[in-house]
Amino acid sequence: MAYTFTTLKTAIQDYVQSTESTFVSQLPRFIINAEERILKECQLDVFRKSSQGTGSSSAYLQKPSDFLAQNSLSVIISGSKTFLLYKQVTMLQDYTPDPATTGVPKYYADWDEATFLLAPTPASVYTFELHYLYRPLSITETGDGTSWLGTNAELAL
């Protein structure tokens, strides 16, 4: 049986035998957290995307707005693709302690939720290709109350 937001909320309330208002008001948050965990843990192919764009001569590269987790990041120079190695921020800072050091990026790290850090800082404007898992709209956010997880993986919810 596929779940919609309404049927999933009802199933949860029936299972725990509670219609208490504080509990019911928190159901969307519980559901979003469950979806997030499923998406991160399972890394289903249906939620993979790629994005290509140019990065400025800055050590920071913006992540797509629907970004959940990276699979790979590459720099494309004259049609040749070179994959960057994913590391921790501290390693990048040790590798290039002076952000003014420029070159073709070799490494990347998560700077924050919306940004990657590159090392060394790109010497010019390069084309980057990111393969990543994206965050689809939650079953709580879609107009019709349905989602891929609710339709195809209802037992996981």
Residue ranges and their predicted role:
Residues 1-157:
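Glycine-enriched, solvent-exposed interface loops adjoining structured elements
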